[in-house]
Swiss-Prot record:
One of its GO terms (molecular function) is metal ion binding. It comes from Prochlorococcus marinus (strain NATL2A). Component of the dark-operative protochlorophyllide reductase (DPOR) that uses Mg-ATP and reduced ferredoxin to reduce ring D of protochlorophyllide (Pchlide) to form chlorophyllide a (Chlide). This reaction is light-independent. The NB-protein (ChlN-ChlB) is the catalytic component of the complex. This is Light-independent protochlorophyllide reductase subunit N. Gene3D superfamilies: Nitrogenase molybdenum iron protein domain.
C-alpha cells in the first residue's frame, strides 16, 4: 500500500441518504418499481433529485407514513399491503417491486422483509417483491445501489459458464463501448449487473469473473464471492490510467496476451490523452479538497492528481473498504491524507484553512462554500454523468475544469474591470 495517511473521523455528517440511488436505478431497470416507505420529506427528496413530476408516473413512489402509523394507531404492515396491491393493480407492467426502507420506517420497526415475503406468497410469482434499506441511519448516498443489488443476488441463476460480469450501474452507451472492447479482446460472454431488465438477471457460478465498475458495492461484492464468483482486483475505470488497468486486469484474468490489449487500447489512449490537454492546462497545480459523500472520492483523487496534475489536500470518504480500494490507494501520491467518516464542522475548518481552488462536496455544502468564495463541484454529478472508460476521460476532467473557468469569469476582479 502507498504511503497515504489513513485517518478516521466521526461526528455530524452532511451527506445524502441511500434513497437517492433510486434516481439512477429506476432508469436502469424500467420494468422495476421502487416504493419508498417513508415520510413526505423522503418523497420530496426523490422527486426533486430525479427532476420528474409525479403526474408523469415515474417508476418510483412513496408510501407516506402518516401520524397514525407513527403513533401505532394503525397496523403499518396492513396499510402497506393495501398500498402495494393498489399500485400493482394500477401498474400491471411492474415485474419487480423494491420496498425501500427509510429513516421513519426503520425507527418504527416496519419489517419490510416480512411484508415482501408475504406479498411474494400472495402474488404467486406474478411480481417479485424485494426489500432493502435506503435509510440515512444506515446508508449514505450510493449505498442504496449496494443494497438493491444485494437483494437481487439470491434470484440469480447458477451457471458454470465462463464469463465476465460487470457489476455496478453504467450509462448504457458506456456499457456498450466497454463490452465491445472486451469482445474484441476475445471475451465473448460479457454480462452486466444490474441488467437493463430486472427479470433478465445474469447467471453466476465458479467460472464467473466479477469486474466492479463502482467502488461502493461492498456488500454486493461479498455476496457474489459467497456465490463462488471471483472478484478481479483492479483500480476503477475512471480516467485513462484507471480504465486501462481495469481492462488489463480482466484480460489477465482470462489469459489474454498484453500485446493484443495494447493494440486495441493504444489508439483509444492516444485520443483520450490528446482530449485531456486543455483540461490539464486548467487543472494542473490547482489545490483540491474532496469531502465525503459518494465513495468515488479516492478514484477521482487518483485521476485528478496523476493525470491532471492537481494537488490533493484531503480525500474524505464515507466508508473505506481497504480490500476494494487497495489498487487505488497504491496509485495515490505518497503524501495523500485519506479521512474515513466525517465531522463536518472540523472538516469545513480544514477546508477554510487550506484555501483550496476547488472542493468536491454534496449539494448541501456547495452554496455556503460558494458564498465564501470557494469554487465547488457537486458529488452527485459524478454519479449521474457518463464518466467511466478511456473515451470518457476528457468528459470527467471537464466536470472539474468547468467550475474553475466559471470562477475566473465571475471573480470580483473580472467584474470590477468590466
Amino acid at each position: 500500500m502507498s504511503g497515504a495517511t489513513l485517518l478516521k473521523e466521526s461526528g455530524p455528517r452532511e451527506v445524502f441518504c441511500g434513497l437517492t440511488s433510486i434516481v439512477w436505478l429506476h432508469r436502469r431497470m424500467p420494468d422495476a418499481f421502487f416504493l419508498v416507505v417513508g415520510s413526505r420529506t423522503c418523497a420530496h427528496l426523490i422527486q426533486s433529485a430525479a427532476g420528474v413530476m409525479i403526474f408523469a408516473e415515474p417508476r418510483f413512489g412513496t408510501a407516506i407514513l402518516e401520524e397514525r402509523d407513527l403513533a401505532g394507531l394503525a397496523d403499518a404492515h396492513d396499510e402497506l399491503n393495501r398500498v402495494v396491491k393498489n399500485l400493482l393493480a394500477r401498474r400491471p407492467e411492474i415485474k419487480t417491486l423494491f420496498l425501500v426502507g427509510s429513516c421513519p420506517s426503520e425507527v418504527i420497526k416496519i419489517d419490510l422483509s416480512r411484508v415482501a415475503e408475504n406479498l411474494n406468497i400472495e402474488l404467486k410469482g406474478q411480481v417479485t417483491v424485494l426489500n432493502y434499506s435506503g435509510s440515512g441511519i444506515e446508508t449514505t448516498f450510493t449505498q442504496g445501489e449496494d443494497g438493491a443489488l444485494k437483494a437481487l443476488i439470491p434470484l440469480m441463476p447458477k451457471s458454470d459458464q465462463k464469463k465476465l460480469l460487470l457489476v455496478g450501474t453504467l450509462a448504457n452507451a458506456v456499457e456498450d463501448r466497454l463490452t465491445s472492447i472486451f469482445n474484441r479482446l476475445g471475451i465473448d460472454k460479457v454480462e452486466s449487473f444490474p441488467p437493463r431488465q430486472s427479470t433478465e438477471l445474469p447467471s453466476i457460478g465458479p467460472e464467473t469473473k466479477v469486474l466492479l465498475t463502482q467502488p461502493y458495492l461492498t456488500d454486493t461484492a461479498r455476496e457474489l464471492k459467497n456465490k463462488g464468483a471471483e472478484i478481479i482486483e483492479a483500480p476503477f475505470p475512471l480516467g485513462v490510467t484507471g480504465s486501462t488497468l481495469w481492462i488489463q486486469a480482466a484480460a489477465d484474468s482470462f489469459g489474454i496476451e498484453k500485446s493484443l490489449v495494447d493494440s486495441i487500447l493504444n489508439p483509444l489512449i492516444s485520443r483520450a490523452k490528446q482530449a485531456l490537454i486543455p483540461h490539464v492546462e486548467k487543472l494542473s497545480g490547482k489545490k483540491l479538497f474532496l469531502l465525503p459523500e459518494s465513495q468515488l472520492e479516492i478514484p477521482l483523487a487518483r485521476f485528478l492528481s496523476n493525470e491532471c496534475g492537481m494537488e490533493i489536500i484531503e480525500i474524505g470518504t464515507p466508508y473505506l473498504n481497504r480490500d476494494l480500494m487497495k489498487a487505488e490507494i497504491d496509485l495515490l501520491p505518497p503524501d495523500c491524507r485519506i479521512v474515513e467518516g466525517q465531522h463536518v464542522e472540523r472538516q469545513l475548518d480544514r477546508v477554510r484553512d487550506s484555501s483550496p481552488d476547488l472542493v468536491v462536496c454534496g449539494m448541501g455544502l456547495a452554496n455556503p462554500l460558494e458564498a465564501e468564495g470557494i469554487s465547488t463541484k457537486w458529488s452527485i454529478e459524478m454519479v449521474f454523468s457518463p464518466i467511466h472508460g478511456i473515451d470518457q476521460a476528457s468528459d470527467l476532467a471537464e466536470l472539474f475544469s468547468r467550475p474553475l473557468r466559471r470562477h475566473d469569469i465571475l471573480n470580483p476582479k473580472t467584474l470590477t474591470s468590466n
